[in-house]
Structure formats: C-alpha cells, structure tokens
Amino acid sequence: THQVNNPNSLGNDNVNKILEDSKGDIWFATNNGISRWRVATNEWDTYYQNKQEQAQVFLALCEDDEGNIWAGSFSSGFYVLDRNTGKELVHYPRNTSDLKSDGKFIMNIYKDSEGDIWIGGIQDVICYLTKEKRFHTYGAQPMRTFMEFSPGKMLLACTYSVLLLDKETGKITFL
C-alpha cells in the first residue's frame, strides 16, 4: 500500500501491471511511476515518481533475456531499466533510424519465445529483434494487448478487432 511520505512503500495505489523478475523482485507499473519491492529484504524503490519532465503513468512491464526491465508509459514512450540498479539505460522514442513509430502511448510489452520484445499501443506495433539489436515496426490498428499464438505468430487485440500477425512476412489477418 502507498504510504504518503514513506519512501519504503508502494509509490502509488493505482497499479496497472505487476511483474515478478527473474531474481524474485516484484515490479509495479503505477499511475505515479514504477515501484520495485525487493521481497528478500522487504525494501521498496520508486522510479519516475512526481517527475514533470518524464512519464508518470506506466501501463506495461516486461523483463528481457538479459534481465533488463522494459517499461511502457502513457505519454512518453518506453524505457529500458537495469534490473539491479533501476537506472535508465535508454528511453525510446528517440532518434533511431529503425524506430519508425512515434510510439508514445504504450499499452503492452511482451517477450516472445525467441526473446524478441513486442511493444504496442495507440500507434504501431513495434518488435525489438534482440539478436539483430534493431526495431521492426508493423502497421496495425491501435492495440490493447497481444500474445504469441505460435512461434512467429502474434495475436493482437485491437480497439475494433482481433488480428493475427505473421512476424516473418508482416502479413496481418483479421479474425
């Protein structure tokens, strides 16, 4: 529970996503930053809380194969954090030649069976191809959530439909 003026508590009671990382810590995406509960020591850390220049509302969390935490915000894209320190490693969107989406409103982040990271929201669906260390953008409708249907196939739950996306060809089929 959030306790005002207590830094050793949840940063905000409005929790949008919960993630248990590979070390057993619990991460919370909230309406006022990201909180991490270090279960073994019963200590709390909070990131991006009350920051006017950065995101505050976070909706999505995912851990990649390297142990980094990907966090999607409702106003300023997505962030990659060092799991051990909570330090921001990178913030997207930024000027990268292969990130073609504006991608500021992130609803979900998902790791598929190949370890690639899928990011989706109000704009496009973006896949970070981990082996190639580059982004690929798929044109799609505004989406809420997704999951891997089978290797190379993603189910996308969009605002007005459900889609099946073929990762290799980029073909999108309405279901």
Please describe what each predicted stretch is:
Residues 1-175:
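Carboxylate-rich, polar loop motifs that coordinate divalent cations or form catalytic acidic clusters
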